[in-house]
Amino acid sequence: MEFVGRYEQDVMNAVGLRGTVSVRELAALLDVSDQTVRRIVRPMVERGEVRKVHGAITAVTGAPTVGEAPFLSRMSEQRDAKVAIASKVAELVHDGDSLVLDTGSTTGYVAQALRGHRGLTVVTNSSFIATTLATIPGNRVLMAGVELRTHDGASFDHFAFEVVRRMKVRVAVLSASAIDPSRGPMVHEHAEAEMSAAMGEIADVRVLAVDATKFGRSALVALPPLRAGDLVVTDRRVRANVRPARLVVASGP
């Protein structure tokens, strides 16, 4: 059935993230019944894309999953913290909202947490985030860019920047590789810093989603300075000065 095929990419996303996902978790994620989940995965199992074990769906060793190993590796690091952060960020977003999300493991979890929302307009340069949210009824997802990086499926070509700079959204959800004590948020690549700056400029509210292990670290390229009205969402209280932004601590999962 057509509706079954519509959910297959969502199943692959979830399995790619976690390796094994229970039928009950998939039912909650897709907002369908357990029986419907079994109908969705049956042809996927027959094609060898996933394996069915007792009460769960698991990745097939050697089968293609979402993204390359570096991205999946980052998704597995500090997973509980990132899930908690994502849940808190999702509380800041309303049905019908407009937002932009950059590429990153934490923003990938934010996209998963936003699957319960409806009517979102989403701009992103991440193919993972785009496919996660594009199949939700009422959502409008704009994928910025044409050429995708191999290790995370993100785009930083001039088309990506052109799309982003033409938009206006309410919320920007951004990530960082480090929060340097003196220089603030930082990333490892110039293109990532430029994209973060472009996304921040088109939003009324900027939300920086970073787990607590990023504080006190440094990276190569500084992001735009934090400003009044910005929110820094993390998983536990840290001794760090994020002023003039406001620190928001998510409760644990």
Language model regions located:
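A general structural motif
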Residues: 96, 117-119, 203, 229
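Glycine-rich N-terminal segment of FAD-binding domains in flavoprotein oxidoreductases
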Residues: 103-105
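Glycine- and other small-residue-rich loops at beta-strand/loop junctions that grip anionic moieties
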Residues: 78, 99, 122, 153, ...
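Conserved phosphate- and dinucleotide-binding cores of soluble alpha/beta proteins
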Residues: 2-13, 17-24, 31-33, 46, ...
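A glycine- and small-aliphatic-rich helix-loop capping segment at beta-alpha/alpha-beta transitions
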Residues: 115-120, 190-191
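HTH-adjacent hinge/linker in prokaryotic transcriptional regulators
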Residues: 2-100, 111-116, 134-138
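Short, compositionally biased
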Residues: 119-122, 247
